[in-house]
Amino acid sequence: MVSVAEIRQAQRAEGPATILAIGTANPPNRVDQSTYPDYYFRITNSDHMTELKEKFQRMCDKSMIKTRYMYLNEEILKENPNMCAYMAPSLDARQDMVVVEVPKLGKEAAVKAIKEWGQPKSKITHLIFCTTSGVDMPGADYQLTKQLGLRPYVKRYMMYQQGCFAGGTVLRLAKDLAENNKGARVLVVCSEITAVTFRGPSDTHLDSLVGQALFGDGAAAVIVGSDPIPQVEKPLYELVWTAQTIAPDSEGAIDGHLREVGLTFHLLKDVPGIVSKNIDKALFEAFNPLNISDYNSIFWIAHPGGPAILDQVEQKLGLKPEKMKATRDVLSEYGNMSSACVLFILDEMRRKSAENGHKTTGEGLEWGVLFGFGPGLTIETVVLHSVAI
């Protein structure tokens, strides 16, 4: 008779969960940040709000963003004028877009990740799909399973309405699945489309304008599995340790509410302060067991909620400017793509590490950290171990 302990032992992988491939995708519509205020106020029929437009121009100029990608273009917005108002019933129109476009963009990223992985998609055992928009049943996980032609018995996990911390959440979940299911190969997809949050300006709700200045569309996919097959699968990063915490005294710092008018975002001004105040504790818990206290000695992947968050974290920890380079480069080129951002940064870092002749996927360093920050205020922490190039 086989014991439960023996069954449990046989079910577990031997090594740590490892990222084996990364793919990214964006809609074709590329938006120039320097001219976006003119476009935004024109398309929302708000050119008469001259002071607010100047304020928005300053927000965009300070955002450190050069370009973003958006599914919404002028043609779509002209067909849906209610989406251009600040508070007009428009959820049906928004939902009709995102329930189609979210899995579609996710598929683009997934196809690239599967191609890099180089294994038949029939070997995918689990699917995690994450998006802040487009609640539907069956969900985007089901749609993607059908569109990719995955096996009908792939084990699916659908995560809706998570927000900007969720790039860390999906890696935490993928790690647990890969390490506790021998031979598991987890396809993780984060797909974010801002059609659910786009709205016209309001001079009484400036926090809504912050979102309009920062958010962009993008999807990223990774394959996660333990015990990579030598000469067949190419490991990129090992997922060593994960944590999630709610920052103390942070209730209401970042809120989102899905209503007839779409998804509305509300931000407290001191989000950067809350993040920087709690970053020390998160890092200590993560790296004290490794005897690491010099945070310039590790590589950094931080969700780029906005430049102020990155500036305050750098200042608080005394980080060298180059530590956040990959993070700032992704923010500059794509804007804040919510949950997908940290996966884009992982992709950027492994590519630049190879191009610049570094010895590891982590800019030549062995250990690294990945942070997600979002509604709650929730902080996700992932300790990464790089791989030799």
From Swiss-Prot:
Keyword annotations of the record: Acyltransferase, Flavonoid biosynthesis, Transferase
Top-level taxonomic group: Eukaryota
GO process terms (BP): flavonoid biosynthetic process; polyketide biosynthetic process
Protein name (Swiss-Prot/TrEMBL): Chalcone synthase 7
A Pfam family this chain is assigned to: Chal_sti_synt_N
Family: Belongs to the thiolase-like superfamily. Chalcone/stilbene synthases family.
EC assignment: 2.3.1.74
Catalytic activity, reaction form: (E)-4-coumaroyl-CoA + 3 malonyl-CoA + 3 H(+) = 2',4,4',6'-tetrahydroxychalcone + 3 CO2 + 4 CoA
Molecular function via GO: acyltransferase activity, transferring groups other than amino-acyl groups; naringenin-chalcone synthase activity
InterPro entries named in the record: Chalcone/stilbene_synt_C, Chalcone/stilbene_synt_N, Chalcone/stilbene_synthase_AS, Polyketide_synthase_type-III, Thiolase-like
